[in-house]
A protein has these predicted regions:
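Charged, low-complexity intrinsically disordered terminal segments
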Residues: 1-152, 158-495
Length: 495
């Protein structure tokens, strides 16, 4: 059923947090640490999927004042439901919860979002909402220009003093919580000055003209308003959920978080985020995150390590990379193989540039989807998972600066979606990412090389002797044909 959307020009009054007479538990834990490191931020890279979920879950339990939560995808699965439940519990003890979701990935969540939004301490808003709630695809026929622009940002901020920013959405595939293939990903937990920047950025999006309150998009009946605000008990009661929660509670990360002994890296950290007006196509070109990113990071002189789930460099991007190679910069790129890519058509936008990049000396590595000798998913961190698909978005320059965030190296991230991330000045973190990258080159990825005839070979170096593969590994004929056909279509700007 067609529902008329509100105008996208309304200004919202800023939400007010619960007023507490004393400092919260998180504030008391964080402030002494930050006082010892003025001007720097405490950073913890979360490449383990269980730790990444534990951070969100426990910070929600610990929060006493506010929770500001912003995501592109929130799945209606075990991990998504657990976080909904713990957010509702926080609201019931007086925490003010603000939930900002991109509406492109909320099918099936309308009833749950209605229930949450009906609690006096929870506000739910949607970015670029769809007018058709059931047959959403119809919206693209009448409103493509707006609906094609999405909010890809991801942040989770507790009491204004701790934040989580990175590449993970909310869902079992990001947290190793179910039987689905695991997305290898990377988040950052941060304390210090950058948290205030994230809070202010959330406020920009919360108040922007692309965002509508849930009540403006979904009607709320009197019956729903008066019913008891409870989520189904079954969400906690099945055996798989109980086992997962037991793993959380007994994890070393959870113990370190509770004791305040997490191994933080202290470094200057800066938030970069797109202007929310990008969601309307009104952002100034100079404000686009990718253009600002390289100004902030500076020009590399030695090496760049790039890890990007979706790598579509475009003609202009290839020219920039090759210009760096000519200046003596070593460039290594890890992305998904066709077999590991969850969006096969995006692979076409990358595959067309592989030979040129290889000819000029760029190192290309493609993540394997599985390890043949393993039958279950094991989380080995950023790039070393079996049964996985790469979803991380990070790169480091000259072993001294690192970007971690939501930004993919593709036209969609550059021109259409809003993005965010941290620039972290840390040799320690850059070295860690380079080490993980180097480990993955042998264990979890194929290296691409050109043979004497200029054809691409995939080199498997997992065994003592190199194994040379002549075609896209672990793929079927129809997949390879589809990618070749997609490469012909003029859709690179959409990828």
């Amino acid at each position: 059923m067609m529902k008329k959307l509100p105008g996208f020009t309304q200004d919202y009054l800023p939400s007010k947090a619960t007023t507490l007479p004393d400092k919260t538990r998180l504030e008391r834990a964080v402030e002494p640490l930050c006082a010892r490191h003025p001007g720097e931020c405490g950073i913890l890279a979360l490449d383990n999927s269980l730790d990444a979920f534990a951070a969100r879950y426990r910070l929600t339990e610990m929060a006493a004042r506010t929770l500001d939560v912003q995501y592109y995808i929130w799945e209606d699965d075990m991990s998504g439901r657990l976080l909904f439940s713990v957010l509702l519990s926080a609201a019931k003890r007086g925490v003010h919860v603000r939930l900002l979701l991109d509406d492109n990935n909320t099918p099936g969540l309308d009833d749950t979002l209605r229930l949450l939004d009906s609690h006096p301490n929870i506000e739910v808003r949607l970015f670029n909402p769809f007018s058709f709630r059931t047959l959403r695809a119809l919206g693209y026929l009448t409103d493509f220009a707006r609906l094609n622009r999405r909010m890809h940002n991801k942040s989770y901020t507790a009491d204004g003093v701790v934040t989580l920013v990175g590449g993970r959405n909310i869902g079992d595939a990001y947290f190793g919580a179910g039987e689905e293939p695991l997305f290898s990903d990377l988040d950052v937990m941060a304390i210090g000055p950058v948290v205030n920047d994230v809070a202010n950025d959330f406020e920009r999006y919360w108040r922007c003209s692309s965002v509508s309150t849930l009540q403006q998009v979904l009607s709320l009946s009197e019956q729903e308003l008066t019913q008891r605000i409870e989520l189904p008990e079954s969400w906690y009661n099945d055996e798989i959920t109980r086992r997962y929660l037991h793993k959380l509670e007994t994890s070393r990360f959870m113990a370190d978080l509770d004791r305040g002994t997490l191994p933080l890296i202290w470094a200057k950290t800066r938030l970069l985020s797109d202007d929310p007006s990008k969601g309307e196509g009104k952002a100034q070109r100079h404000s686009l995150l990718p253009l600002r990113l390289f100004d902030v990071m500076g020009s590399p002189t030695e090496r760049i390590d790039i890890i990007s789930a979706y790598f579509v460099p475009t003609r202009a991007g290839v020219a920039q990379l090759l210009n760096l190679v000519r200046k003596g910069v070593k460039i290594a790129i890890l992305t998904n193989s066709l077999a590991a890519n969850d969006v096969a058509v995006v692979h076409a936008g990358y595959a067309r540039w592989r030979k040129k990049l290889l000819r000029y000396g760029v190192e290309l590595y493609e993540l394997k989807p599985t390890r043949e000798h393993e039958t279950v998913v094991h989380d080995r961190g950023l790039t070393g998972n079996s049964g996985s698909s790469l979803h991380a978005k990070t790169f480091s320059i000259d072993g001294s600066k690192v970007f971690i965030g939501s930004l993919n190296f593709d036209p969609r991230s550059t021109l259409l979606n809003t993005e965010m991330g941290f620039v972290i000045e840390s040799e320690t973190l850059a070295t860690l990412i380079h080490k993980r990258f180097t480990q993955s080159q042998r264990d979890a990825a194929w290296q691409l090389r050109l043979d004497r005839w200029g054809r691409i070979n995939w080199i498997d170096r997992q065994q003592e002797e190199e194994k040379v593969l002549k075609k896209e590994p672990a793929t079927r004929f129809w997949q390879r044909v589809l990618v070749r056909l997609a490469a012909i279509l003029p859709v690179e700007w959409l990828l």
